[in-house]
Amino acid sequence: MQKMTVLAALLSCSALFSAAQANEGAHWGYEGEIAPANWGHLSSEYATCATGKNQAPVDIQSTVKAKLPALPFHYQAGGNAIINNGHTIQVAYAEGSQLTIDGLPFTLKQFHFHAPSENLIQGKQYPLEVHLVHGDPQGNLAVVGLMFEEGKANPLLTTLWQQMAQQVGSQLTLSKSVNVADLLPHDRSYYRFAGSLTTPPCTENVRWLVLKKPMTASKAQIEQFAKLMGHPNNRPVQPLGARQIVE
């Protein structure tokens, strides 16, 4: 039941992901007294942000070599609304797009952005990262992370940024549903680790899959997102502890 409550609160389009937690619990953010270092002390609901042992994001360095199965993305055009929840820009996704992990179907609920990246790869921080958030009927969560490096403009980002909600709390219907598969690289090799949500309540037992190959976004696209946020919206990397990262 607790998993289902978290899934409903964090992934429902009407809940607006992070905004729901801000409304239902203590206000949190990325600067000052409500910055990531203090999240665990803002509310008892956020205690895991401070006490959790399997927190995300992480710096992906030492890894264990394994024969990870290919990720079977079954995505279709379903991104239909763009939301500015004050913490990120999020695109709500209609039902029907799935990713199978460990033999289980996870439905894509939404995707959102962080600048700079939250996860690091070999100590490198990218200027932008997108998180594709999935859930299953039992309330389990899986997040695919994809990095962007500065380069050519990304066509899908162009479409999204042209319709980006400017006011906090605003939601706009996209003129045409987008397919997040258009963001994915051809090389979909990845790292896998056990982690958490990177925002309060920092719920753990999240399957994390970080793609190795970055895509590109133009300097103007990166700056446009950063300007709208007004400040970095990334949680610092968390201790890896006893966890292993598999590739």
Predicted regions and their residues:
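Bacterial N-terminal signal peptides
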Residues: 8-15
